[in-house]
Amino acid sequence: LHLGGRTLPHAVMMMIPESWENDTVMDPARRAFYEFHSSIMEAWDGPACVTFTDGTQIGAVLDRNGLRPGRFWVTDDGLVVLASEAGVLDLDQASIVRKGRLEPGRMFLLDLEEHRIIEDDEIKGQLASEHPYDEWLYSGLVRFEDLPDLEHIVHTHASVTRRQQVFGYTEEEVRKLVAPIARTGAEAIGSMGTDTPIAAISDRPRQLFDYFSQLFAQVTNPPLDSIREEIVTSLAGTMGPEKNLLDPSPASCRMLQLPFPVIDNDELAKIRHMNKDGDMPGFSVHVVRGLYDVAGGGRALKEKIDAICADVSRAVADGARIIVLSDRHSNADLAPIPSLLLTGAVHHHMVREKLRTQAGLIVETGDVREVHHVALLIGFGATAVNPYLALETGEDLAREGVFVQGVEPAKAARNVVYGLGKGVLKVMSKMGVSTVSSYT
């Protein structure tokens, strides 16, 4: 980034930004700077205290969480000391004219030509005013509220029940997983530990998701408190083709803003219709049917995944910028491919073909019904997840008054989206990850 023409502080601010998403008192120009650059480069959230220099300027920056120590001293003869602990040098206390510590997301910079310390606000204020980032965002970034509303489709109880059978929903899953989140907008609270046999040795059919487990941060990478430290976290992201990292322009932020990694059925419908009239070619959508011939068994599954990967390559070459992997419309002959298997296959195929930055991946799936499933899909390459059957199940429970009483169907669906998104935040926090862009 520095060799590409950006100043050293500019490059550092792009790579290790402060937590701007939930900061309501941040200068709007600086906020626009960070929001613009978040659309072209994912943040690194540490934990780290990173030092840098180009021979003329030398400095340090602390991660957005402030999870690494950084203290500095300035003496009256011009000596500057920055270290992780106090007392690394035996300095005469009478000679110290200034001392302090690096704060979360703040930068400490010395200019050896100007012989001065450049303050954090001066650095960032100057960089934020270099370009009209707020105007670029206004003209380039597309938000859901800017898109026209479409008619909401209501599915019958029989339709929901049939598809629950297709995806192997059990009464226990509906009652203990989907119903609580549809009712309250939060995961059901349970005790620690489980006596369920691990998937690898279970004698019952299990979802592919069950073969994976969550990790948690230990020792050098401390976990976060997703409730009390929510201000430094973010579930927002962008979707669309990524432009040249070394040539910033208004087109660099021509993307769709996603406030949550989980989207509901109406939001997915909006995305599908974005370029319906051909006036938004940068958001051309290609839908891939993730279904395979059941009679063909494993060979048919492999052949279908290979065919889907080839189809995605052709679609991106033809201008598609949003790929939707959908397992809707299954029947007695065509079964849904496990969404985790399909997502991982397509994501890594696009990486190998150098196409991944040219298109976003949305997974429209019926086999997702809990937070762990969403977290896995995001970790395996999905930009956004639409758990349509979980949403329709929540609506159906509210409409029928079964397990979910006193909640409107639309509210139940929104609760599912909110609860799954907040659950992903909790999973990220256990790993010490602050932003969903750093988690993917």
Annotated model-derived regions:
Residues K99, K124, K176, K243, ...:
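Context-gated lysine
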Residues V436:
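Active-site/ligand-binding-proximal alpha/beta "capping" segment
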Residues T184, D195-K354:
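Non-catalytic terminal/interface segments that mediate subunit docking, oligomerization
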Residues L1, T7, E18-C49, G55-A60, ...:
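Glycine-rich phosphate/ribose-binding loops and adjacent secondary-structure elements
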Residues T440:
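Active-site loops and adjacent core secondary-structure elements that bind or stabilize anionic groups
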Residues L1-S249, D264:
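Conserved short alpha-helical segments that host acidic/polar catalytic motifs at enzyme active sites
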